[in-house]
Structures are given as C-alpha cells and as structure tokens.
Swiss-Prot record:
<dbReference type="InterPro" id="IPR019972">
    <property type="entry name" value="Ribosomal_uL14_CS"/>
</dbReference>
<keyword id="KW-0699">rRNA-binding</keyword>
<comment type="similarity">
    <text>Belongs to the universal ribosomal protein uL14 family.</text>
</comment>
<comment type="function">
    <text>Binds to 23S rRNA. Forms part of two intersubunit bridges in the 70S ribosome.</text>
</comment>
<keyword id="KW-0687">Ribonucleoprotein</keyword>
<dbReference type="GO" id="GO:0003735">
    <property type="term" value="F:structural constituent of ribosome"/>
</dbReference>
<dbReference type="InterPro" id="IPR000218">
    <property type="entry name" value="Ribosomal_uL14"/>
</dbReference>
<dbReference type="Pfam" id="PF00238">
    <property type="entry name" value="Ribosomal_L14"/>
</dbReference>
<keyword id="KW-0689">Ribosomal protein</keyword>
<dbReference type="GO" id="GO:0006412">
    <property type="term" value="P:translation"/>
</dbReference>
<dbReference type="InterPro" id="IPR005745">
    <property type="entry name" value="Ribosomal_uL14_bac-type"/>
</dbReference>
<dbReference type="GO" id="GO:0070180">
    <property type="term" value="F:large ribosomal subunit rRNA binding"/>
</dbReference>
<comment type="subunit">
    <text>Part of the 50S ribosomal subunit. Forms a cluster with proteins L3 and L19. In the 70S ribosome, L14 and L19 interact and together make contacts with the 16S rRNA in bridges B5 and B8.</text>
</comment>
<keyword id="KW-0694">RNA-binding</keyword>
<dbReference type="InterPro" id="IPR036853">
    <property type="entry name" value="Ribosomal_uL14_sf"/>
</dbReference>
<protein>
    <recommendedName>
        <fullName>Large ribosomal subunit protein uL14</fullName>
    </recommendedName>
</protein>
<dbReference type="GO" id="GO:0022625">
    <property type="term" value="C:cytosolic large ribosomal subunit"/>
</dbReference>
Length: 122
C-alpha cells in the first residue's frame, strides 16, 4: 500500500531514481494506492542528464508493491520494492524502457503500453 509521504523507486529511464508520493488520485479522501493506481509525486533523486528535474511534480502509475496483491484465483503476489513508472497526462510512459517485472493488473487497468515495454509481466 502506497500512501502520502511514501518513497518509491522509478522503474523507467526518465532519469528519476526516487519519487515521493503526495497524493493518491481517485477520490477525495482516498488514502492508499496499490498496483495500477495513479499517484501524484515529486522527484526526489535524479541521475545526471535526466529528462526530469529534482522537485518536478509528475504523475506515476504503481507497477510493484511490497504489500501482497490478492488475485481472484486465490494466489498472492509480492515484490521486493515499491516502484512506479512516470506517465504523462494521457497515461503514456515518459520513458522508453521499463526495468524489472510488472504485475498483470497494469494491463487490466488500461496501461497496455507499460505492460508491452516491460521485460516480464507476472
């Protein structure tokens, strides 16, 4: 579960390394976000020559969480890190590559471009 003040790793090649969530989109009092949810976050740590700058406010979709993901068939899924992919206003990823596996729920939520760029969909 991702909430306000949560720090996440960035799983794409935009140049941002870490972001900090400050709003979960999808309701006036929504507290937690999980895989496939969109959050508004601030860039906290960057690589040199990146397309985003430190302090930029960006939208991101969560692709991995340390909290369990419960599926309808009874199986559960858990990742090692909390990670996200930075997106634009239309929902397309800003980067051209995605690092690491992503959950299948990403495709179910309508982020087909992210799931097709990912090396593995679990």
């Amino acid at each position: 579960m991702i909430q306000q003040e949560s720090q996440l790793k960035v799983a794409d090649n935009t140049g941002a390394k870490k972001v900090k969530c400050f709003k979960v989109l999808g309701g006036s009092r929504r507290r937690y976000a999980t895989v496939g949810d969109v959050i508004v976050c601030s860039v906290r740590d960057i690589e040199p020559d990146s397309s985003v700058k430190k302090g930029d406010v960006v939208k991101a979709v969560i692709v991995r969480t340390r909290n369990d993901i419960h599926r309808k068939d009874g199986s559960t899924l858990r990742f090692d890190t909390n990670s996200c992919v930075i997106i634009d206003d239309k929902g397309n990823p800003k980067g051209t590559r995605i690092f690491g596996p992503v959950a299948r729920e990403i495709r179910d939520r309508g982020f087909v471009k992210i799931s097709s760029l990912a090396p593995e969909v679990i």
